[in-house]
Curated annotation (Swiss-Prot):
InterPro entries: Arte_nucleocap, Nucleocapsid_C. GO terms for molecular function: RNA binding. It comes from Porcine reproductive and respiratory syndrome virus (strain Lelystad). SUPFAM superfamilies: Nucleocapsid protein dimerization domain. Multifunctional protein which associates with itself through both covalent and non-covalent interactions to provide the basis for viral assembly. May play a role in the regulation of cellular gene expression during infection by interacting with host HIC. Plays a role in the inhibition of the dsRNA-mediated IFN induction pathway by inhibiting host IRF3 phosphorylation and nuclear translocation. The lineage of its organism: Viruses, Riboviria, Orthornavirae, Pisuviricota, Pisoniviricetes. The keyword Electron transport does not apply. Its main location: virion. Transmembrane segments: none annotated. GO terms for biological process: symbiont-mediated suppression of host cytoplasmic pattern recognition receptor signaling pathway via inhibition of IRF3 activity. Coiled coil: none annotated. GO terms for cellular component: host cell cytoplasm; host cell nucleus; ribonucleoprotein complex; viral nucleocapsid. This is Nucleoprotein. Keywords: Host cytoplasm, Host nucleus, Host-virus interaction, Inhibition of host innate immune response by virus, Inhibition of host IRF3 by virus, Inhibition of host RLR pathway by virus, Ribonucleoprotein, RNA-binding, Viral immunoevasion, Viral nucleoprotein, Virion.
Length: 128
């Protein structure tokens, strides 16, 4: 009887590790993880994609939206929404059913200065 208890204890101590999952399942999982990592390009080898620059197909050529950075676009949208929600600007409805909303706001000085420089250089390049 004593021999039987010892062999049972040995079987328990050699039980698969990994929170009760059989070793086979753990190996399959590890293999799948390695396979998926091989399919993904490594950090140093991958070409970093630039975020796609939004285009404004309905905007005129001289529209400043073509020159806005992502931060500036976000600031503009936030300012427009805040102005609308607080009742700033002018909102109207035409007889044809078109809604119009017009508002003026200022961006932070650094962004304004950058936009003035960018738009003035593009305007002077267009003139020459």
């Amino acid at each position: 009887m004593a021999g039987k208890n010892q062999s049972q204890k040995k079987k328990k101590s050699t039980a698969p590790m990994g929170n009760g999952q059989p070793v086979n399942q753990l190996c399959q999982l590890l293999g799948a993880m390695i396979k998926s990592q091989r399919q993904q390009p490594r950090g140093g080898q991958a070409k970093k994609k630039k975020p796609e620059k939004p285009h404004f197909p309905l905007a005129a050529e001289d529209d400043i939206r073509h020159h806005l950075t992502q931060t500036e676009r976000s600031l503009c949208l936030q300012s427009i929404q805040t102005a609308f929600n607080q009742g700033a600007g002018t909102a109207s409805l035409s007889s044809s059913g078109k809604v119009s909303f017009q508002v003026e706001f200022m961006l932070p000085v650094a962004h304004t200065v950058r936009l003035i420089r960018v738009t003035s250089t593009s305007a002077s390049q267009g003139a020459s």
